[in-house]
């Protein structure tokens, strides 16, 4: 009899714990888009390259499991991120090794299903702690942001309008593990940062300071990188006008060779300013951005940084063709002696834009942009990236469903031909239409 009671008690405990777990609140949100793109040229040099046209889609789902008011598990995953009918990428693609550019999964996994986030959020009396794979490499405005998941431990504490933050992130690990046997020790990329932000009714301002240590290549070439950065920003609203600005300043050793003692220093600056006047039916705005180029290609100071360490980032996409990461991700690099990877680098950028909302559901916009290089990559080369005119129409079909049609035309500059000055460039244009569902 006692044994039966113990069995019943054990079953009761299992049921109790199971019921508690099943009672956790689950909240889902996300978006789905399906789009079609036509790009007239895949090469910037005259008489080279062809056109391309295709459809593509992605489903992104965020799920939050609320275990208690102060404790939750948060996940995010992407499903069927692929071009319709296109060949699937080789599962052994290099992204299997380092992950897709904006995902914790590989390109092959994203074509099926890839989890990007899985982390615990605990709101304690001394601050909010988050532990696990979560968003990183994004701060302030969208300028120079890369929004990529990383394994991270983060802390944030809010009092009044002030938020204090600190985190440590593992961006890459090449030390020996069960999945990858290597002879290297301490071969990884780590990032440490502290930040503070103040929020008020009309805006916010903050500053982040970080230290990035890249020792991933020490087993191949005996050097490492140690980069420091400071990123102040502000976003403020003055009546109908919204202004945002950000400064990115990086310094340190881009390459520090342990064997020879050689050091390549980094000293680079980026500036971003944007203003938008929203007058109800009409709006107008402008953008200025600057990213330093290298003053002297043969000295021991790099003023331009790297494409990932001092660039416009993938989140900031001011045009449909020029400096647009999404276009590059789906249609690929626009080839030339200097390829266009869709990321602003070594450039001055200027844009003016206007728009009208004839009815609440319809937004018609147009922008004119111009960019030129800050410094020459080769003696005597031209600096102009080109002029671009973009026209877009966004129509809100329902509260959760919208349709966008955009046309961009690029008067290609001669920068892309590099030092091959005998080549002629060719203009390019793009047409995109996109259906987006949010939930």
Model-predicted segments: where are they?
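Internal, well-ordered domain-core segments that constitute the primary functional module
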Residues: 128-200, 204-206
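Long, well-ordered mid-to-C-terminal structural blocks that present hydrophobic/aromatic surfaces
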Residues: 263-313
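Short catalytic/ligand-binding loop motif for oxyanion handling, primarily in non-cytosolic enzymes
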Residues: 83-85, 138-140, 174, 294-296
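Short, catalytically relevant binding-site loops at active-site mouths
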Residues: 213-214, 250-252, 290-294, 371-373
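A conserved mid-domain beta-alpha-beta active-site/ligand-binding segment of alpha/beta enzyme cores
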Residues: 208-212
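Beta-barrel outer-membrane channel/assembly domains of diderm bacteria
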Residues: 3-133, 153-160, 164-166, 199-203, ...
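Flexible glycine-rich, low-complexity coil/linker segments exposed to the extracellular/periplasmic environment
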Residues: 299-344
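Short glycine/acidic-rich loop motifs that flank beta-strands on beta-rich extracellular proteins
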Residues: 216-219
């Amino acid at each position: 009899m006692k044994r039966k009671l113990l069995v019943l008690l054990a079953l009761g405990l299992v049921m109790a714990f199971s019921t508690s777990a099943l009672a956790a609140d689950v909240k889902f949100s996300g978006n789905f888009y399906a789009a079609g793109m036509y790009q007239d040229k895949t090469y910037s040099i005259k008489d080279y390259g062809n056109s391309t046209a295709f459809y593509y889609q992605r489903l992104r789902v965020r799920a939050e499991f609320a275990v208690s008011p102060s404790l939750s598990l948060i996940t995010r995953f992407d499903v069927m991120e692929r071009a319709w009918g296109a060949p699937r990428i080789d599962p052994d693609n290099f992204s299997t090794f380092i992950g897709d550019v904006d995902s914790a999964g590989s390109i092959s996994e994203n074509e099926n299903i890839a989890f990007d986030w899985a982390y615990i959020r605990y709101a304690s009396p001394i601050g909010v702690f988050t532990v696990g794979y979560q968003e990183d490499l994004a701060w302030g405005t969208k300028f120079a942001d890369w929004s990529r998941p990383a394994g991270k431990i983060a802390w944030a504490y809010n009092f009044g309008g002030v938020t204090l933050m600190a985190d440590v992130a593992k961006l890459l690990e090449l030390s020996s593990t069960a999945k990858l046997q290597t002879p290297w020790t301490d071969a990884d990329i780590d990032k440490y940062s502290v930040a503070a932000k103040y929020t008020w009714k009309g805006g916010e301002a903050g500053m982040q300071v970080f230290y990035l240590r890249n020792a991933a290549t020490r087993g191949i070439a005996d050097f490492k990188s140690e980069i420091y950065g400071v990123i102040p920003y502000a976003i403020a609203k003055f009546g109908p006008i919204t202004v945002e600005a950000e400064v990115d300043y990086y310094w340190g050793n881009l390459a520090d060779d342990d064997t020879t003692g050689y050091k390549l220093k980094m000293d680079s600056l980026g500036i971003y300013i944007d203003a938008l006047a929203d007058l109800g039916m009409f709006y107008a705005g402008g953008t200025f951005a600057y990213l330093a180029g290298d003053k002297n290609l043969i000295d021991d100071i790099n003023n331009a940084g790297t494409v990932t360490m001092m660039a416009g980032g993938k989140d900031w996409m001011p045009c449909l063709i020029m400096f647009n990461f999404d276009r590059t991700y789906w249609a690929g690099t626009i080839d030339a002696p200097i390829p266009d990877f869709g990321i602003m680098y070594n450039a001055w950028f200027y844009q003016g834009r206007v728009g009208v909302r004839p009815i609440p559901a319809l937004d018609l916009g147009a922008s004119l942009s111009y960019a030129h290089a800050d410094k020459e990559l080769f003696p005597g080369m031209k600096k102009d990236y080109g002029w671009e005119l973009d026209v877009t129409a966004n129509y809100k079909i329902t509260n959760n469903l919208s349709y966008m049609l955009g046309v961009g035309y690029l008067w290609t500059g001669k920068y892309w031909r590099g030092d091959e000055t005998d080549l002629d460039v060719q203009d390019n244009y793009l047409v995109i239409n996109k259906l987006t569902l949010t939930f």
